Amino acid sequence: MSDRMAKFKAGMPKDAIEALKQEFKDNYDTNKDGTVSCAELVKLMNWTEEMAQNIIARLDVNSDGHMQFDEFILYMEGSTKERLYSSDEIKQMFDDLDKDGNGRISPDELNKGVREIYTKVVDGMANKLIQEADKDGDGHVNMEEFFDTLVVKLPIGMGPCKDEEYREYYKNEFEKFDKNGDGSLTTAEMSEFMSKSTKYSDKEIEYLISRVDLNDDGRVQFNEFFMHLDGVSKDHIKQQFMAIDKDKNGKISPEEMVFGITKIYRQMVDFEVAKLIKESSFEDDDGYINFNEFVNRFFSNCPYKINSLYWPIYLGCAVSI
């Protein structure tokens, strides 16, 4: 956590911090992973997903899309991440985006500003993905490593499975049928799982497994099954791999990963920037963001997909995806 956050905590009594820590563990972090997700807030507070996302965006200092304990302190103390900054620092952020210095940020300036920061952090994102996926330590990602790790890190699917609560529901269902707890389903377990609502023949189950089994081990891991629910086939993922593997040598280099991330995320960034302009320019509805709008709306509620690209430059945080 940043020095700013440390200073904020330093002004609080130790017993208050301990009490908040217990509250965080007992009532908020329901899956005990050390963070509070949008899905957990929705369930706990009976909020809409949009409300939960907005709350997390206002507190998400390290821009990972979750609420860490230190960020939870901000929430419980009625503060927000922008209060960790001085007015001069926020003004500097605004001026960095306002390229022509006319006191307002145009859609084009926002596009260019976000992309400038984006190009600076994409190398770090690529290196992090390579490190996470590279099981054999050769500095590259082969097809099997891509299947095992990256298909759940990159936004390849377009279906409802990007909803965290949806994923959690199916993960719990999946685990009920994973009798030995090894994280995968055998043919028999898969048959039992899939036949809850509809009866399938052995041949149909075998065909389904062949479509879902990304690493060809004859079993179905949860990530494989979940990608199938998201409308992503094995052939589609292979096409994604080959599109990133520019030299067609069967493995992805760090340089190729930079290219792949840029291509995959470009459309997402376009969508998020357009959404930011629409949601931020609410006072005079002129299609631009003035300084008041920047402070009161844009900076506070910036979605974490853009947050993770822009604000870490000022926070000194690593980008997580």
From Swiss-Prot:
Expression across tissues: Aboral ectoderm, a squamous epithelium covering the surface of the late stage embryo and larva.
At which positions is Ca(2+) 5 bound?
D178, N180, D182, S184, E189
- For this entry, the protein name equals Calcium-binding protein LPS1-alpha
Keywords for this entry? Calcium, Metal-binding, Repeat
The residues that the entry says bind Ca(2+) 6 are D213, N215, D217, R219, E224
Which segments cross the bilayer? Answer: none
Record: residues binding Ca(2+) 7: D245, D247, N249, K251, E256, D284, D286, Y288, E293
Any one Pfam family match given in the protein's UniProt record, by short name: EF-hand_5
Domain EF-hand: from-to ranges: 15-49, 47-82, 85-120, 121-156, 165-200, 200-233, 232-267, 269-304
Any idea what job this protein has?
Calcium-binding protein involved in larval development and metamorphosis. Likely to function as calcium buffers mediating the transport of calcium from the sea water to the blastocoel where calcium is required for skeleton formation.
| Species of the source | Lytechinus pictus (Painted sea urchin)
Which positions bind Ca(2+) 2?
D60, N62, D64, H66, E71
Q: Where does Ca(2+) 1 bind?
A: D29, N31, D33, T35, E40
